[in-house]
């Protein structure tokens, strides 16, 4: 843990272990924060807030830019930590660090974009303004699956806006998340501006509620499952704390009858199997027009069935270990249910270990669990449809709404389809897994609310205030 510029253990000395999902080897040992530790972290951030909020934008920008460079220099450390704690491939870890550094650089660019507005007033001699100010302490709760990207995203824009931060790391990758805070400390961030807590899994709910309930915490951002996101939203509502939630997904990729199949195959191979499918934007439903289904599925099978798989600690792979045996069990259940109800196995299959091969199931229907449930693993459903209208209806047949993709050589047609998809994000002729630091990233419906990047991020992590200046006398009401 890191509080008030110092590394520290839990106040009662408690710790918890994270073990490698593949062989059970000890990956990290981290402090198990107490409620007193949670309060101390918030108090440290609150004490540092006035000075940080008042800091000039040039100094804030330079610290964020320096932090981006330091993060990049930690690439090998992040790669080793992610492989040990979550089974992530070197490729995925490097991508995480690269994008995280860009998020930090984009945050540095935001410091001079926090502007306001002069509003015409009905009152004679009155200057009426809308201004944005830092909100206060921001609690960021980051997940394990893209730990560097999402850990940095939880704090970069809030810091750029003049807030101080408490980052609550994931119980599944405490060492990985701690490297982010070490990088910011090395970059020169003042004590208390960034604080970091780790907690035992059984204590997560109590720790989060303790911090959300603290009057100093003015914003909460959370990235994780829809189930846990609902719990976080309930806690935030109880204490009237605004939140930004990026939750689960069931991303559809629509392969229309005029699609460039080779391009679609490459995009879906990445979108479906990056980090073994353990990405909120991961392509979960491959919706393909019946007229091109056979050719497309054959090409996709050939592409993904040869993806390298293995232990990322010892070899270069695309598919490393999934995060735990619960993922294996869940995916095996979904495969079994689909096959029992008429689906056809294209490649892959059930797994006995956390090294799971890329699996495609054809002829999936709404009668199967995998049509509706997020796999969050390398098991993907192919749904055949007979028209553009049916493809859109199939894509929208879910409560989730994070990412989507449409493949067509006719861009006007693809745009028409994209406008009818109920998702916060849609990519035409590109993978569902995409992110850029400056974009308004976020979902709708059961995939959450609010946005992280660009102007939307500024709006989320500042208070909008109305202020007036009366420069004449007289005109008394009474």
Predicted features along the sequence, with ranges:
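N-terminal Rossmann-like NAD(P)+-binding subdomain of aldehyde/semialdehyde dehydrogenases
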Residues: 1-126
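Rossmann-like NAD(P) dinucleotide-binding subdomain of oxidoreductase/dehydrogenase enzymes
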Residues: 117-263, 385
């Amino acid at each position: 843990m890191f509080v008030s510029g110092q590394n520290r253990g839990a106040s009662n000395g408690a710790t918890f272990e994270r073990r490698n999902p593949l062989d059970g080897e000890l990956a990290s040992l981290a402090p198990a924060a107490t409620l007193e530790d949670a309060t101390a972290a918030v108090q440290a951030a609150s004490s540092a807030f006035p000075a940080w909020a008042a800091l000039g934008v040039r100094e804030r920008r330079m610290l964020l830019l320096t932090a981006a460079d330091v993060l990049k220099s930690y690439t090998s450390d992040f790669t080793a930590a992610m492989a040990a704690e979550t089974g992530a491939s070197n490729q995925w870890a490097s991508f995480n660090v690269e994008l995280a550094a860009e998020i930090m650089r984009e945050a540095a660019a935001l410091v001079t974009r926090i502007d306001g507005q002069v509003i015409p007033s009905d009152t004679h001699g009155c200057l009426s303004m809308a201004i944005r100010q830092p909100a206060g302490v921001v609690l960021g709760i980051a997940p394990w699956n893209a730990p560097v990207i999402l850990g940095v995203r939880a704090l970069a824009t809030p810091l750029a806006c003049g807030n101080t931060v408490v980052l609550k790391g994931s119980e599944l990758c405490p060492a990985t998340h701690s490297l982010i805070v070490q990088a910011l400390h090395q970059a020169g961030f003042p004590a208390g501006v960034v604080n970091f807590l780790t907690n035992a899994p059984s204590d997560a709910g109590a720790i989060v509620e303790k911090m959300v309930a603290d009057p100093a915490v003015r914003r909460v951002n959370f990235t994780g499952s829809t189930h846990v996101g609902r719990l976080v939203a309930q806690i935030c509502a109880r204490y009237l704390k605004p939140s930004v939630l990026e939750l689960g997904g069931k991303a559809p990729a629509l392969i229309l009858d005029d699609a460039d199949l080779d391009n679609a195959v490459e995009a879906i191979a990445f979108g479906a199997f990056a980090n073994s499918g353990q990405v909120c934007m991961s392509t979960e439903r491959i919706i393909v027009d019946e007229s091109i289904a056979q050719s497309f599925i054959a090409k996709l099978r050939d592409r993904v069935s040869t993806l390298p798989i293995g232990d990322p600690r010892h070899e270069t792979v695309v598919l490393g270990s999934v995060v735990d045996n619960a993922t294996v069990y869940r995916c095996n259940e979904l495969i079994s249910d689909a096959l029992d109800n008429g689906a056809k196995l294209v490649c892959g299959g059930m797994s006995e270990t956390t090294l799971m091969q890329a699996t495609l199931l054809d002829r999936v229907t709404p009668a199967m669990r995998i049509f509706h449930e997020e796999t969050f693993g390398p098991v993907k459903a192919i749904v055949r449809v007979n028209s553009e209208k049916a493809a859109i209806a199939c894509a929208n047949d879910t409560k989730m709404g994070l990412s989507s993709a449409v493949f067509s050589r006719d861009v006007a047609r693809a745009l028409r389809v994209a406008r009818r998809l109920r998702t916060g994000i849609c990519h035409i002729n590109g993978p569902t897994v995409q992110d850029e630091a400056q974009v308004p990233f976020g979902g709708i419906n059961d995939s959450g609310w609010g946005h992280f990047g660009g102007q939307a991020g500024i709006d989320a992590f500042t208070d909008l205030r109305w202020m007036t200046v009366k420069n004449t006398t007289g005109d008394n009401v009474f």
